[in-house]
């Protein structure tokens, strides 16, 4: 029982609202900003087992039902769990969640997609609630916690739906997020202008870096969450800093322009990657012309 106790308590609390629609138990817990919940500590995974969190993490199952529009997903979870438990082997809930999301969406979404959406839905709670969108009781919940971008090094757990909400300056800035795990995280740049004019941009990695810009006059927030890979959970660290404005041609950012930068550029051409630092002629593509210009820079 204890191995997956978080799942049992999560389901029981969610089903209480299904059986008794007027129940305010879950809403009351999620409205409290002074306890550990998926809103006050978004960095916790969906299986965090301490501080009565499993009861409050019923928000995760509530999210799945509301976002996917199919309450049968909870039944699929329990049916699959029962079959695997009957085999006598240890049961991991994460493949079960992944299969359930895949099933109710006919393959259109994965658990990684659900984690990304869950991150967005949790951000728009409390004072940030948007009428008619996201959680139907979002305005009654605590406003999700954010971090300051002045804390340049961040950590989240992989594979389990952890999130970080990072407030950025209301300025025109070029920024870069760097990590050794670019495939294990998902990043959105969220900009809110004049109240409810919301723009959400999905950022794509360029090697181990995510480049983006913020705008003056808008609330700028970075939403970072872990993807699902099926591997054991590890700590993912990432840093946030101003965009790199070093030497032209210094592709590997080691402070000099030399043959190592040529090697890095050629590797990017072969792998199809695109990093702005390698686009020497700024034509938004990396090819032999950039190699020629880089060699000229080295020889000059």
Predicted regions and their residues:
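Cellulosome-associated attachment modules in secreted, modular CAZymes
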Residues: 243-300
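Functionally constrained cores in energy, signaling, and assembly domains
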Residues: 1, 7-11, 161, 225, ...
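Acidic/polar loop patches that form or flank catalytic/metal-binding clefts of enzymes
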Residues: 72-75
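Beta/coil-rich, acidic/histidine-enriched accessory regions frequently appended to metallopeptidases
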Residues: 83-246
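Generic preference for hydrophobic/aromatic residues in regular secondary structure cores
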Residues: 17, 26, 38-48, 97, ...
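Acidic/His/Gly-enriched intrinsically disordered linker/tail segments
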Residues: 2-67, 78-117, 122
């Amino acid at each position: 029982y204890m191995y997956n106790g978080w799942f049992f308590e999560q389901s029981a609390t969610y089903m209480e609202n299904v059986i008794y629609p007027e129940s305010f138990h879950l809403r009351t817990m999620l409205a409290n900003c002074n306890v550990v919940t998926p809103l006050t500590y978004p960095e916790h995974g969906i299986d965090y087992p301490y501080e009565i969190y499993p009861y409050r993490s019923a928000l995760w199952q509530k999210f799945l039902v509301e976002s996917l529009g199919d309450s049968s997903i909870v039944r699929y979870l329990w049916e699959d769990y029962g079959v695997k438990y009957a085999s006598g082997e240890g049961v991991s809930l994460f493949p079960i969640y992944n299969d359930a999301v895949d099933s109710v969406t006919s393959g259109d979404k994965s658990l990684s997609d659900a984690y990304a959406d869950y991150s967005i839905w949790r951000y728009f709670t409390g004072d940030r609630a948007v009428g008619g969108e996201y959680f139907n009781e979002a305005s009654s919940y605590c406003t999700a916690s954010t971090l300051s971008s002045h804390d340049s090094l961040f950590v989240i757990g992989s594979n389990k739906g952890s999130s970080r909400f990072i407030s950025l300056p209301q300025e025109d800035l070029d920024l870069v997020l760097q990590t050794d795990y670019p495939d294990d995280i998902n990043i959105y740049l969220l900009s809110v202008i004049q109240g409810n004019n919301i723009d959400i941009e999905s950022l794509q990695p360029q090697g181990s870096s995510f480049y983006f810009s913020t705008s003056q006059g808008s609330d700028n927030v970075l939403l970072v969450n872990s993807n699902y890979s099926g591997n054991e959970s590890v700590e993912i660290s990432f840093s946030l800093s101003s965009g790199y404005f070093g030497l032209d041609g210094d592709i590997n950012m080691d402070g000099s322009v030399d043959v190592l930068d040529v090697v890095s550029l050629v590797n990017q051409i072969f792998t199809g990657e695109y990093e702005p630092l390698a686009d020497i002629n700024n034509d938004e593509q990396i090819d032999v012309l950039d190699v020629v210009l880089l060699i000229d820079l080295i020889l000059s």
